[in-house]
Amino acid sequence: MPTSNQSIRHGREKKRRTDRTRALEKCPQKRGVCLRVSTRTPKKPNSALRKIAKVRLSNRHDIFAYIPGEGHNLQEHSMVLIRGGRVKDLPGVKFHRIRGVKDLLGIPGRKRGRSKYGAERPKSK
C-alpha cells in the first residue's frame, strides 16, 4: 500500500486492455490465403468435428479461422475474408470466415439467416 506522498508523486497506473483480435490490426476484416484446412474436436462437454483452416493474412500473421455453416469448398491457396469473433468451444480459434466472399462460396438453398452465410435470395413463384 503506497503512502499518500508516494501516491501524489507517482499517481496510479492505467490498466491496459488486451486486444483479442490483434492480427486484424484494428481493421473490420482482412484478406488471407488458406495454408491448411482441417477439423478439430471441441472442449468438453461438446462433441463434433469443427471445420477450421490455418490462414496467412495479408499482414503476414498466421491464424486459425472457423468455417461456419454446413459444407464448404475451401482448399489450400484459397483466398478468403476474415472477421473477428471467437468460437467458444475451440481454444485458440478467434476468427471467422465470411461466406459468399472471394473463394469461399455461400450455402445454396439456405432460407433463414441468409446474410450470415452468403446465400442467394430464393426465387419467388
Curated annotation (Swiss-Prot):
One GO MF term: structural constituent of ribosome
Entry's localization field: Mitochondrion
Pfam families from the UniProt entry: Ribosom_S12_S23
Biological process, per Gene Ontology: translation
Entry's transmembrane regions: none
Listed InterPro entries: NA-bd_OB-fold (IPR012340), Ribosomal_uS12 (IPR006032), Ribosomal_uS12_bac (IPR005679)
GO CC terms of this entry: mitochondrion; small ribosomal subunit
Top-level lineage group: Eukaryota
Start and end residues of each stretch annotated as Disordered: 1-24
Annotated Basic residues bias: 9-19
Keywords from the named record: Mitochondrion, Ribonucleoprotein, Ribosomal protein
Function of the protein: Protein S12 is involved in the translation initiation step.
Family: Belongs to the universal ribosomal protein uS12 family.
Name of the protein described by the UniProt record: Small ribosomal subunit protein uS12m
